[in-house]
Amino acid sequence: MSDHKIATREEWLAAREQLLAREKEHTRLGDELARQRRELPWVPVEKEYRFDTDDGEKALVELFDGRSQLLVYHFMFGPSYQAGCPVNSSMADTVDGVLPHLHARDVTFLLVSQAPLEKLRAYKRRMGWRLPWVSTAPSDFNFDLGFSYTEEQTREAVAQMRATGLTIQSSATGPETGTGLPPIVEHNARSTGTDVAGYLTESPGFSTFVHDDDAVYHAYSTTWRGLEFLMGYYPILDHAPNGRDEGDAWQQWIRRHDEYGE
């Protein structure tokens, strides 16, 4: 039997009122953070980035598709990957169904990855997504924003971590293994069909851009736990009696939606 506290209805109502006050405080703080996010200064994008798309090679400004705001998810699918990252895939699942609502608010949302376009197309068909997905292969877009690295860079970093015992553990990557690499990294590397160094050429991220007065501006970027707003199942699980219930297996339970039950 669970050792969870059992209460009367009156005791529950009193505790619920206390929690409600904290929930309202959390909501107000979220509103304030959203306001501050909107007020961040914009940085002009002066480099001419090119992307491979289903309609041929395009410039960054063309990706807005006639809207004034462009939201980009830096999806972890590197050149050596055979499949997309399962955690990133779960985020795409969340966003895919809300595209019409975003378009209604003058927002274009798309995925960008380093892998060749044909790989992205095949994986998109498998997942059944409608999300537009473009390859950054023709340009340094992902590298310049800090979400892609060369395999030489990652192999050197991984070798150094394993040789010295250094770790990349943080609140962003989950519990340490003692080997310098969190379990989620090795787990997802296997899942994407590459090795650790190949997997770490990519980092997850979210960036926003504005098209205003014939110029494009970079407005915002975030990564790691800053991406949880795209993981629609997490706030739902946070309201479940057992919460996320991940323990030390941080995000290792996440599968592609066609792999549960295997």
Residue ranges and their predicted role:
Residues 103-120:
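Catalytic nucleophile loop
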Residues 113, 135-137:
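Residues at the C-termini of beta-strands that transition into short coil/loop
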Residues 1-70, 75-105, 122-128, 132, ...:
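Non-globular targeting/processing and membrane-anchoring segments
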